[in-house]
Amino acid sequence: MTKVVLLFIVLIVAIQAKKKLSADEIKQINQDCLKSSGMDSSVIKNIVSYDTFPKASDKYTKYLECMYVNQGYLDKDGLISYETIEDFILDFYDLDTVKLAIEPCVVHQDGKSGGERAYNTAKCLIKNLEKLEKQHEKEHKDITGKLA
């Protein structure tokens, strides 16, 4: 779960669009999105500290929409760019895992706004990655148990 939550945080604050941004630019975007959404920065910090995924709220979905737009994960029409997200997640997982995690989410562009779609996508990806990690851990445990 920690790896998945950390990935989510990086997905929020790291830029993996066509243009790489500097750490200062990323910090500025994060600050701008926090300010424009009215989001409390402690909520973002708690995601890492407590392994929790925040509940949807107007402020949080506005924050996510701002971050996703600036990262290239959300296009100007408010639709999720799964290709861009996939490129980013490939830095952390193998291609098969990424495809299995993203595939169930792609068919859904659920939400009335880009922010709701960003939230629903993040939630879907985290759920799928957690499931795949648990499955992988179980398979690894089964294999190592048979070898002992």
Where are these regions (language model features)?
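Cleavable N-terminal signal peptides of Sec/SRP-targeted secreted and luminal proteins
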Residues: 2-17
